[in-house]
């Protein structure tokens, strides 16, 4: 079982509440295999991996928001292409 102290992660994010939200979002991505882990998995659960990534400064709110915006833009582009093909 991995032991993770959250103090370093809290310092990276700002407060415990935002840390929980960011770690939960990242853990969900890892659990659903939407994104690959940025640190070695070492047989850890997604929540532990997410906390380790935050602690190392690899993930934060800005990075998560940018990823989601990029995915939304790509999805919108695909949908617009599909609509244009249907209207032809």
Swiss-Prot record:
It catalyses: RNA(n) + a ribonucleoside 5'-triphosphate = RNA(n+1) + diphosphate. Keywords: DNA-directed RNA polymerase, Nucleotidyltransferase, Transcription, Transferase. Gene3D superfamilies: 3.90.940.10. It holds the Pfam family RNA_pol_Rpb6. GO terms for molecular function: DNA binding; DNA-directed RNA polymerase activity. One of its GO terms (cellular component) is DNA-directed RNA polymerase complex. Its EC number is 2.7.7.6. It comes from the Bacteria. Belongs to the RNA polymerase subunit omega family. The RNAP catalytic core consists of 2 alpha, 1 beta, 1 beta' and 1 omega subunit. When a sigma factor is associated with the core the holoenzyme is formed, which can initiate transcription. This is DNA-directed RNA polymerase subunit omega. It comes from Mannheimia succiniciproducens (strain KCTC 0769BP / MBEL55E). The lineage of its organism: Bacteria, Pseudomonadati, Pseudomonadota, Gammaproteobacteria, Pasteurellales.
């Amino acid at each position: 079982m991995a032991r993770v102290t959250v103090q370093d992660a809290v310092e990276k994010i700002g407060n415990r509440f935002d840390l929980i939200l960011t770690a939960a979002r990242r853990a969900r991505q890892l659990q659903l295999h939407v994104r690959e882990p940025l640190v070695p998995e070492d047989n850890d659960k997604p929540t532990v991996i997410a906390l380790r990534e935050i602690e190392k400064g690899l993930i934060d709110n800005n990075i998560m928001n940018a990823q989601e915006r990029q995915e939304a833009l790509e999805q919108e582009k695909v949908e617009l292409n599909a609509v244009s093909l249907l209207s032809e």
